[in-house]
Amino acid sequence: MPAADDGTPAALAGRVVLVTGAAGGLGATAAHACARAGAIVVLLGRKVPKLNRVYDAIVNDPAGLPEPVNYPFDLAGAGYDDHAELAMRIQAQLGRLDGVLHCAADFAGLTPLEHTDPAAFARALHVDLTARWWLTQACLPMLRQAGDSAVVFVVDDTVPGAAYRGAYGIAQQAQLALLATLHAELAASPVRVSALRPGPMRTPLRARAYVEDQDLRARDPARYAEACVRLLAPQGAVHRGQVWAPAP
């Protein structure tokens, strides 16, 4: 069993965790942190070469981490049946699922709603809200089988009604409603739901709205990787039903 530096069992030892957007800024570093914490990580993302880099970083870690599983998947184009098939494949290959970390997001850049491309609006709303729910819904039967499991939504710090964020900004607020509803409905179940609201991070997504060398507030996403692990681990129970905004 993987152990922490002090010899105690690692926080996610024996668990299987699905990370969406696993090749992205936060997703990649969070996936590696989950593996360091003892989890078998299912790496979900669109681009195979980028997923392979995350996979290689984990399997080549000198600590000898559990081997992850690559699952190329396009959230924007997948139907609900594709999400259900993903859940069935995890069940067949790994036999369990203990956590889902939603890092994948779609944001085309700052644009007035009036001038937003209709297809881009629909895509962002789907990836940032509908696909997150579809995947959660498909995985709930497996998550219920675990004695303790977690669904974690990574949300932005976008102020409600902030201009030019388009469907991305709207989806951020809708996710909070989804979180509250799921928390109420799953209160008596072993499935915990919570959200992580990291501070500004230096990621390709944020670069679509800010000039990097002028974005003095942004931090390395690695600063929030351990927060992801905490919410997925049993210790995350203290944040059940909440939006956690840890200090960087």
What are these regions (language model features)?
Residues 16, 23-24:
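Conserved glycine-rich cofactor-binding loop
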Residues 20, 97-105, 128, 153, ...:
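Rossmann-fold scaffold of SDR-type NAD(P)-dependent oxidoreductases
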Residues 39-54:
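Conserved glycine-rich Rossmann-like NAD(P)H-binding loop of the short-chain dehydrogenase/reductase
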Residues 61-80:
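Rossmann-fold cofactor-recognition segment
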Residues 76-84, 88, 105-122, 164:
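Conserved mid-core segment of classical short-chain dehydrogenase/reductases
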Residues 106, 133, 144, 148-188, ...:
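Catalytic loop of short-chain dehydrogenase/reductase
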Residues 114-133, 152, 175:
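Catalytic Tyr-X3-Lys loop
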Residues 188-191, 195-196, 203, 211-248:
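C-terminal helical subdomain
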